[in-house]
Amino acid sequence: MRRSILVLATLAFTLGGVSTGVALVQIYQMNDFQKSIKTEYAKLDTPQPVQAKFVPIKLGEVIGVISIPKLAETYPIVQGTDDKELKLGVGHYVNSVMPGVKDNSVLSGHRDSVFSKLGQLREGDSVIVRTSSGTFTYRVRKSWIVLANDRTVIVPTPTATLTLTTCYPFFYIGSAPKRFIVSADLVQN
């Protein structure tokens, strides 16, 4: 009996140590990533001409920063919308134009992290996107809910539009059946 308790205590201690080690590695990696974001953010201070479509950018590369004043939130925007990229911040849909360009720029984020408060946005709220091409202010036009497989939210638009997408319902456990969409129009750059 005493030996069993000793074995269990050793296992518990080992698991605790491993868990602590994993947590410390994750904290270190997050701090390292945040430092790289600050470096990339500093590069955004040099305006570049706005590029039209399909600029080759590496997946996971920081392309800008999104700020939503009403939510008091600012996040990095990275190229790509797969889970790997969305763990880094807000993802830019690769087949959409860059923010600030005439057409539909689509950004996606996880409902349980960067876009957890997206449902609080209302018509007229501001969304500010800063890239190496400049700072672009968008005004929310509307929000709505679609099925997860609805591709109409990523279609081209005749004006500079920003479309934000996240899974819905916000507190759903598992793979969400719907998407929450916010559409905003460029008002200033």
State what each model feature region is:
Residues R2-N189:
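Solvent-exposed, non-transmembrane regions of membrane-associated and secreted proteins
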